[in-house]
Amino acid sequence: MLRAASRAVGRAAVRSAQRSGTSVGRPLAMSRPPPPRAASGAPLRPATVLGTMEMGRRMDASASAASVRAFLERGHSELDTAFMYCDGQSENILGGLGLGLGSGDCTVKIATKANPWEGKSLKPDSIRSQLETSLKRLQCPRVDLFYLHAPDHSTPVEETLRACHQLHQEGKFVELGLSNYASWEVAEICTLCKSNGWILPTVYQGMYNATTRQVEAELLPCLRHFGLRFYAYNPLAGGLLTGKYKYEDKDGKQPVGRFFGNNWAETYRNRFWKEHHFEAIALVEKALQTTYGTNAPRMTSAALRWMYHHSQLQGTRGDAVILGMSSLEQLEQNLAATEEGPLEPAVVEAFDQAWNMVAHECPNYFR
């Protein structure tokens, strides 16, 4: 049961404070709870996945353990990491929580990714090396979901897919996922896998939020056609949709965050830090005040409620939102927002207007 899992995480947090190393926890016998359902007659809302990119960077082992525990205690069960996150520290921390990840009776699901960056590739040897290294860090025999983090345009995709099929046959992962691929590449991959009898991808992880909707035009119809679930990352545009930033902030010294003080900061600024984007956020904030008055929800809450109630995500198809965090407090606030109801029509319309303001400079969902 997830309560047992969260207790195991709590014990791991205590251990991490007592010593610098991590220890292997005994696999936990847990039965998966039914997914949370909306009120009678309402559509099933998308699932929530915990993004762990900040574990090992802005969150140490103890804070990470507390966040995983809080996530599990709210009835969620999917964790998302990657080979490259914090140079492997994200996976190491998750592996030390004693969850029994990858065991047959563990209902806490774990996903990781292999990438073609920083000397890596999606050639067979590199894919195998990355996945097997991830399994060692996570202290598990297999992962539930194994993504190709982005296309490797220097490697024939057939080589990559054949290698993935071999690893799947060896029992090293359950489901295959894609991330940051163009819709035509998804169609090509699904066709190749089907014609060769290789494992088919079943999940796509992509960039999607209230002011970044490029996936709606072509990618989502492609995924529906081939039967892939869609997991949305950057639901708050890297934190821009919290409303806490001003456009002029880029010119001064800022605290470490998604947009400042890390190796990916420039990528995130190029992706979202546009003057029109800040104007669009101001428009939504004005609509919130006009519509709700003194009871207006925070911008963060409104952006997440848009994802769960007004986006093109479909809970009945297994779609999900990936929630990252840099602190336990932030996670708890965001989880609370995911449980709130739909927005008033005037605010939904304001989000649509905001999207129209920034659509011309929307970052590509593919790489």
UniProtKB/Swiss-Prot annotation:
GO terms, biological process: lipid metabolic process
Modified residues (Phosphothreonine): T48
Keyword match Mitochondrion: yes
Residues reported to bind substrate: H149, Y268, R271, R367
Reaction catalysis annotation: 4-hydroxybutanoate + NADP(+) = succinate semialdehyde + NADPH + H(+)
Record flagged with keyword Nucleus: no
Residues at the active site: Y85 (proton donor)
Tissue: Expressed in liver, kidney, testis and brain with low levels in skeletal muscle, spleen, heart and lung.
One protein family per Pfam: Aldo_ket_red
Location of the transit peptide in the chain: 1-46
Region Disordered, annotated ranges: 1-45
Binding site for NADP(+): 80, 179-180, 205, 234-244, 258, 326-334
EC number: 1.1.1.n11
An example Gene Ontology CC term for this record: Golgi apparatus
SUPFAM superfamilies: NAD(P)-linked oxidoreductase
Compositional bias per record (Low complexity), positions renumbered to this chain: 1-31
Modification type N6-acetyllysine: residues: K136
Family note: Belongs to the aldo/keto reductase family. Aldo/keto reductase 2 subfamily.
Assembly and interaction partners: Homodimer.
The protein's name: Aflatoxin B1 aldehyde reductase member 2
